[in-house]
Amino acid sequence: MSWGAMHSNNYQNKIQKECSFTRFPILCVQTLMGFESTKHQQHIHLMSALVNKSIAESKLPTSYFSNFSSQLLAKDSQGVRAVTDHCEEMMSMSLKRLEKSLLALQNSPTKNKDDIQTWLGAALTFQQTCKDSVNSLGLSERNEVIKKISQKMDYLSQLTSNPLALVNRIARASYPKNSTYNRRLDEEQGDFPNWVSAKNRKLLQAPRINANVIVAQDGTGNYRTVSEAISAASGNRFVIYVKAGVYKEKIRTNKDGITLIGDGKYTTIITGDDNARRGTSMPATATFTITGDGFIARDIGFHNTAGPQGEQALALNVASDHTVFYRCSIAGYQDTLYALALRQFYRDTDIYGTIDFIFGNAAAVFQNCYLVLRRPKGSYNAITANGRTDPGQNTGFSLQNCKIAAGSDYAPVKHKYNSYLGRPWKQYSRAVVMQSSIDDSISSSGWVEWPGAGGYAKTLYFAEYANVGPGAATSNRVKWPGFHVIGPDVAVKFTVANFIAGTSWLPSTGVIFDGGL
């Protein structure tokens, strides 16, 4: 055997071994066989090659979706255009996270593992979101255009899943063996993750704010609308103080470093009433949409007043990394909060809704929040609907020290309906409710299937720990393989400080948190 053949066999053996840890090993091997050289034999270069392939395949021509739009024969041409526009945006956001992942891999995969896990997982989420949008058109899957888009998104998802699986191996290997201890936070730092800098921490806690601009409806500020203030934002951290009032606006921003501070969660309110029944696509119904990173909100409300008859009607659509909502109110009915992707932290925030009113695929922790069930249009309520599509994603919803209760409109009639802690939107849905107060609005079964998705019961991860109240008993909970009543050794993994599948947005060492069980 020649040296070249031996080298080739060694390389092939190596990639077959590495690819055996992925969900799509055949595609993994096919991808890496195109990168046969000595420099690619290092583990890091294999992962970079896989991400590079995802990037290359994600760089679709600008005409890609518009061509599909013109080919689709649909009654609602406006709806088709909205969906294809949304797909273009999702692909742009996916590409951004893939490119950030590649740069982080090239710098230091071990040091940056948390970021890489989050960004690759988000890229997957954005790809799946495009597919979901296309499927929401209600056209037959036999439609060739629909099939092409769905197949393309599935292919991209498989390409992206493979490097994520390999990065997760690095994360598991480097994670401290004694990872179930309880972290506490020194008191001067408050209850915020370490990526909330000391400056921003003080900003969130300060009784008065030194704002860059002031918004006031009566003309006493720099601007009369929140939209105008955000348009003027510049710099790394731009603080906008919004005086008391109800601001009827529909806002969308991709700017990084925006901070909104109001006079109180029910005193300063940004509100809208767009809804799916009006013909607007689900994501576009949001009163406030944020895709820029580092968004912070304090003492302000985000509402959608479409009511239950409006069907899907979002108050918030959040695809921002390192996001904080502190002492806010988020009010709607169906699909109130779209926690779409990336790392999100909610503290002392009131969230109102009916069906799936916290949904999406972010790595999100809700601490000390008040989750209010409203009277539904349909037959039942479900608080969470997590959209995790890949077991390698570090995503999920953790509800800790929350209060779950019926609202004033629901309490008198709650005996007529069932309410649940959540249902699995996607195959690997993950939600944990712990140390929370649960009133008797919640059904004794606790959780409910997604219609037509009974198989998810084996692949989802739903768990409860140390909850109290008349709705907290677990003896009659669902008997699914994926449902767990956990102990403290497992529950601690889902605290703000130590959410194992979401450690990319939390410190791995050093800073201590108050998130104890």
Give the location of each predicted region.
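Generic preference for well-ordered alpha-helical elements
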Residues: 12, 25, 58, 84, ...
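Sequence-level preference for short, compositionally simple segments enriched
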Residues: 44, 136-155, 160-517
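Extended, amphipathic alpha-helical segments that serve as helical scaffolds
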Residues: 40-127
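Amphipathic, well-ordered alpha-helical segments in soluble domains
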Residues: 24-27, 31, 57-64, 90-100, ...
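Functionally engaged cysteine thiol sites
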Residues: 19, 28, 86-87, 91-94, ...
